UniProtKB/Swiss-Prot annotation:
Enzyme Commission code(s) on record: 1.1.1.23
Cofactor note: Binds 1 zinc ion per subunit.
Keyword Zinc: yes
Highest taxon listed in the record's lineage: Bacteria
Pathway this chain belongs to: Amino-acid biosynthesis; L-histidine biosynthesis; L-histidine from 5-phospho-alpha-D-ribose 1-diphosphate: step 9/9
Gene that produces this protein: hisD
The protein's role, per its UniProt record: Catalyzes the sequential NAD-dependent oxidations of L-histidinol to L-histidinaldehyde and then to L-histidine.
Name of protein: Histidinol dehydrogenase
GO cellular component, one term: cytosol
UniProt organism field: Salmonella paratyphi A (strain ATCC 9150 / SARB42)
Length: 434
């Protein structure tokens, strides 16, 4: 089925409808699972030496010093244009503004007289950021991860990326307060952050995207007691666009293609009650595709994508909620009117002038988002991911006395005698004092 094929949703059977919203299967092959397991073992047992060996083997780079020096970081910044530095600073300002606003107010209440309950927030002490290498350095992800880590107050923020690390990544890391940067990539970087090595510190939580090996490494270390927590499950990137007859076909096409160029496994879906708009978008996609440097990649992604015609916008919303896209773009006449009905999406973009690119780079929202249907239970990355909540309770004598019989009754019903005794002993002590 080509992307030019218009699909009438209401002519499809329930089975066909489910198939249309089924994502391409992703699972680590047995060979990837075994390879990653071996890498984790080797890094845990051999440390820096094996990290250098893996750099030579996988990155074709001989690394002597794993830690990037301040002089190297300064030199990287000097090679960048002022225009790019100013753009990064503008993006960081917006990211700071949005994420600072996410600070939770403290909770301090009396649930009943003499029973005080609080909720306080503390930063995750140490975090590791992983940034992939490749021909297109993802320095924007540095901004998205390091900025909330700094706002949260994480004491240690370190970054790993495959050597040679792009100047843009080094500068972005320094700009956002990353304390240490290491020339380590792939699953071995995740292992180093999870277990520590002579050079790379062990961290409490690991953030960042990567290939199948990195994703599998994050999964494995997150399930080990000696490992580290991770940000969220990963999957291929995706966008769903809801458009009506008031949408601009060229704008819709550009948003679909900006997602499709991410990779051949990206998924793109258009939902519209207007078949004419669907046809015009398909034509615009073909026109714009011819001009893209990554046209081959985008074309592969489009082969698994969908143009779906519905009966109305309400049905578009229902289908979108069922799919739960990573990115949801609503290009309709009154886009904001639909927001309250949206229940599952990573990030929502409203109207003609809110392209996905804005959120990817500089509007202020975070571009690290749940994908592959995880929007049903997971949230977009935010300040809370770099923090943890802790509760505090304090009972006065009077508060304890008033609550004691309730606790004793509940503990006895669960046959937890020691729990009941912890209350009864105190009740008796109060009686003796009286």
């Amino acid at each position: 089925m080509s992307f030019n094929t218009l699909i009438d949703w209401n002519s499809c059977s329930p089975e066909q409808q489910r198939a249309l919203l089924t994502r391409p299967a992703i699972s680590a092959s047995d060979s990837i699972t075994r390879t990653v397991s071996d890498i984790l073992y080797n890094v845990k047992t051999r440390g820096d030496d094996v990290l250098r060996e893996y750099s030579a083997k996988f990155d074709k780079t001989e690394v002597t010093a794993l830690r990037v020096t301040p002089e190297e970081i300064a030199a990287a910044g000097a090679r960048l244009s002022d225009e790019l530095k100013q753009a990064m600073a503008a993006a960081v300002k917006n990211i700071e503004t949005f994420h600072s606003a996410q600070t939770l107010p403290p909770v301090d209440v009396e649930t009943q007289p003499g029973v005080r309950c609080q909720q306080v927030t503390r930063p995750v002490a140490s975090v590791g950021l992983y940034i992939p290498g490749g021909s297109a350095p993802l320095f924007s992800t540095v901004l998205m991860l390091a900025t909330p880590a700094r706002i949260a107050g994480c004491q240690k923020v370190v970054l790993c990326s495959p050597p040679p690390i792009a100047d843009e990544i080094l500068y972005a890391a320094q700009l956002c307060g990353v304390q240490e940067i290491f020339n380590v990539g792939g699953a071995q970087a995740i292992a180093a952050l999870a277990f520590g090595s002579e050079s790379v510190p062990k961290v409490d939580k690991i953030f960042g995207p990567g290939n199948a090996f990195v994703t599998e490494a994050k999964r494995q270390v997150s399930q080990r007691l000696d490992g580290a927590a991770i940000d969220m499950p990963a999957g291929p990137s995706e966008v769903l666009v809801i458009a009506d007859s008031g949408a601009t076909p060229d704008f819709v096409a550009s948003d679909l293609l900006s997602q499709a160029e991410h990779g051949p496994d990206s998924q793109v879906i258009l939902l519209t009650p207007d078949a004419d708009i669907a046809r015009k978008v398909a034509e615009a996609v073909e026109r714009q595709l011819a001009e893209l440097p990554r046209a081959d990649t985008a074309r592969q992604a489009l082969s698994a994508s969908r143009l779906i015609v519905t009966k109305d916008l309400a049905q578009c919303v229902a289908i979108s909620n069922q799919y739960g896209p990573e990115h949801l773009i609503i290009q309709t006449r009154n886009a904001r009117d639909l927001v309250d009905a949206i229940t599952s999406a990573g990030s929502v973009f409203l109207g003609d002038w809110s392209p996905e690119s804005a959120g990817d780079y500089a509007s202020g929202t975070n571009h690290v988002l749940p994908t592959y249907g995880y929007t049903a239970t997971c949230s977009s990355l935010g300040l809370a991911d770099f923090q943890k909540r802790m509760t505090v309770q304090e009972l006065s004598k009077a508060g304890f006395s008033a609550l004691a019989s309730t606790i004793e009754t509940l503990a006895a019903a669960e046959r937890l005698t020691a729990h009941k005794n912890a209350v009864t002993l105190r009740v008796n002590a109060l009686k003796e004092q009286a």
